[in-house]
Design a protein with these regions (language model features):
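Nucleotide/phosphate-binding catalytic cleft detector across ATP-hydrolyzing
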Residues: 2-63, 67-193, 211-213, 222, ...
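Glycine-rich beta-strand-to-loop/alpha-helix junction loops that act as flexible
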Residues: 65-70, 197, 288-298
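Short, well-ordered secondary-structure micro-motifs
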Residues: 76, 181-183, 205, 301-305, ...
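Gly/Ser/Thr-rich active-site loops/lids in small-molecule metabolic enzymes
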Residues: 89-91, 218-233, 302-303, 310-316
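Acidic, glycine-rich loop-and-beta core segments that form the ion-binding/anion-interacting portion
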Residues: 180-248
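Nucleotide-binding motor/catalytic cores of P-loop/tubulin-like NTPases across gene-expression machines
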Residues: 211-214, 292, 296-343
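Extended hydrophobic-aromatic, low-complexity segments
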Residues: 214-216, 226, 238-240, 270, ...
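A short glycine-/small-residue-rich loop at the edge of a beta-strand within enzyme catalytic domains
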Residues: 216, 220, 231-234, 249-268, ...
Length: 373
């Protein structure tokens, strides 16, 4: 498991940022996306910050963090508001009132909301395509999707960052951050799923009609593939990781057997994903298919197996935005970190949900890190 750190410069009026530096350092003290050893986690953050500062020549004080632990969950809720203006025109105040009521309807015992986004609107019982502001009616209703996290896990992350000397500007679900880079507006409109395969977790985000309609995290990841190879060949974890990534291959490790081991674990992953799609009635029904990112997305079997098991078009993410970036741009395993840059540039607001951070005035220099896979 690694901590990915990116330092970007985003010139005023530029459509894409310049990558100043991107570094990856070992992560300790984290299991399945949440902190299990606070001192080790603090050391991991501090080590990553120091290396990024050394390579970029920039002092890092503030950060946008991604989080993708197994304690994340998504829940739908509803809210409403009686239109406040005498002429019945829907105002931003009415919209905020309905959204607040929807969030307050969620049971938050031991949990905190880290992201929320409207799924649909109704005005006087009729569906409203797009934003309702400026329309006229009596009662506004909204359905939202909120992503929550165990309060203890979130507090541990904030504490670790503070002890490492870094101010947390915002915390964003990892697959939501990756979607900012990996998905197009057209894909979001017709229906698409982002699958982020991390070391110990797989997180998914489903979009339709331009909004987030589904989200889940599964306690399985590319580390499980490494463990399976180690058991299958009775070798060390280091050797197994090298075989998984293709950096070593010999006659003593038959390719067919390696592929069978990897395929079996990937099949488990896609079976879990399809189960969730069936739950939200989208199995085989996303025209823009599946876009796969993360450190576990690089194996040659991933695309074909996803296509067969999910019955959807599938590809490993490779958005044009990355090719337009200047500097040491990495592969799709870095999509979460780059996606945080898109969120952070929105002048203090997340473009598609609650949260966001950073300043977009002049040159945008921000420390972006993918700490929890």
């Amino acid at each position: 498991m690694v901590t990915r750190t990116v330092v970007l410069s985003w010139p005023k009026d530029a459509s894409t940022p310049d990558v100043i530096t991107s570094v990856a350092t070992p992560t300790k003290g984290v299991r399945h996306g949440y902190i299990v050893n606070l001192p080790d986690a603090v050391s991991s953050i501090r080590r990553s910050v120091e290396l990024a500062e050394k390579e970029s020549g920039i002092t890092i004080k503030r950060a946008i963090f991604s989080i993708g632990g197994t304690s994340l969950s998504a829940e739908n809720s509803n809210g409403s508001a009686i239109i406040s203006k005498s002429d019945g025109e829907v105002s931003n105040f009415d919209i905020k009132t309905a959204l607040t009521q929807a969030e307050e309807a969620i049971e938050l015992k031991n949990r905190k909301i880290i992201f929320s986004s409207p799924v649909s609107w109704k005005l006087d019982g009729k569906d409203v395509p797009g934003k309702p502001e400026g329309m006229h009616g009596v009662k506004l209703e909204v359905k939202i999707l909120s992503i929550t996290c165990l309060a203890q896990h979130l507090d541990d992350l904030l504490s670790a960052a503070a002890e490492a000397g870094v101010e947390v500007v915002d915390v964003v679900p990892s697959s939501v951050a990756a979607s900012e880079i990996a998905l197009t507006d057209r894909q979001r409109a017709v229906g698409v799923m982002l699958v982020n395969i991390g070391a110990e977790t797989v997180s998914i985000a489903i979009f339709e009609n331009g909004v987030l309609i589904g989200f889940s995290v599964f306690p399985i990841g590319s580390t499980d593939i490494t463990n399976d190879i180690a058991l299958g060949f009775r070798i060390t974890l280091e050797e197994a990781e090298s075989i998984k990534t293709g950096s070593i291959m010999a006659t003593s490790y038959p390719k067919r057997k390696v592929d069978d081991i990897i395929e079996a674990r990937l099949s488990d992953i896609f079976e879990l994903i399809d189960g969730y799609l069936k739950k939200i009635k989208r199995s085989g029904l996303l025209p823009a298919g599946v876009v796969i990112t993360g450190g576990g997305a690089g194996h040659a079997l991933v695309e074909g197996l996803a296509k067969d098991m999910l019955r959807l078009p599938s590809r490993v993410g490779a958005q044009e935005l990355l090719s337009n970036m200047k500097g040491p741009v990495r592969d799709s395993s870095w999509f979460v970190s780059y996606g945080l840059a898109i969120l952070g540039k929105e002048n203090g607001e997340s473009p598609r949900g609650k949260g966001g951070g950073g300043s977009a005035k002049g040159i945008f220099k921000e420390f972006l890190r993918q700490f929890l896979p």
